[in-house]
Amino acid sequence: MAKTQGHMALQDSTQNEDRRIVKSKRALRGALITLMETKGFEAITVNDLCSAADLNRGTFYNHFSDKEDLLVSFENEVMETIALIRSEMALLSVKDVMAYCVSKKPLPFLVRLFDYFREQGDFLHAVMGPGGDPRFGSRLRDSFCTNLIQGVLHEKYRNDPDPFVGYYISFYASAYLGVINHWIDTGMKEDSQTMALIAMRLLFIKPGEPIRL
């Protein structure tokens, strides 16, 4: 009985500690977002972060080595979730994508993606803004947007060494990053289904066609 009670006490202690860690990281994340928006990441100090999060420096250094480590850890969390959503794309053929386009139905994984972007809107607005991390936009472009474009290309072009194919992919990947940026910068007014349709429509619109959804 004593062993059981001791085990339960240890579990409760661990759970309480886990909750404290989650609470501390959430507070630091909120502080980081606010400070990137107000003074820019380069000007932020660990003292600024601790003061804004109402935490002591010891708590900060229990989890992160410096402010860059803090930022990258949150960026990595976002990129890992995006990668999971992106993996759904591998299950789709070009024929599947075209069928959604013809029926004017949004691709489900794109809807989930924009749902996640909305959920992370405050962080994305800060980190992709002028006071954020200019490297993050490049990561998003290279790891997600490029893969998205490659995924909807006909199979024979996906590994084509022709330089023009590389320029084509680079052009559309950068354009898609611009779409995401514009949506976030303008307050994410469109819902996720509409944004998924916009993303699909932009890829297949032809020269001379009306610029309408």
Model-assigned labels for residue ranges:
Residues 2-39:
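Basic, helix-initiating cap at the start of DNA-binding domains
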Residues 3-5, 163-185, 193-205:
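Hydrophobic alpha-helical segments that form the core
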Residues 20, 90, 124, 154, ...:
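Terminal, non-globular segments
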Residues 35-69:
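Helix-turn-helix
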Residues 45-46, 74-89:
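Short, basic, alpha-helical segments at the C-terminal edge of helix-turn-helix-like DNA-binding modules
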Residues 87-119:
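Hydrophobic alpha-helical connector segments
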Residues 111-138:
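Amphipathic alpha-helical segments used for helix-helix packing
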Residues 131-156, 166-174, 208:
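Amphipathic alpha-helical packing segments from all-alpha helical-bundle domains
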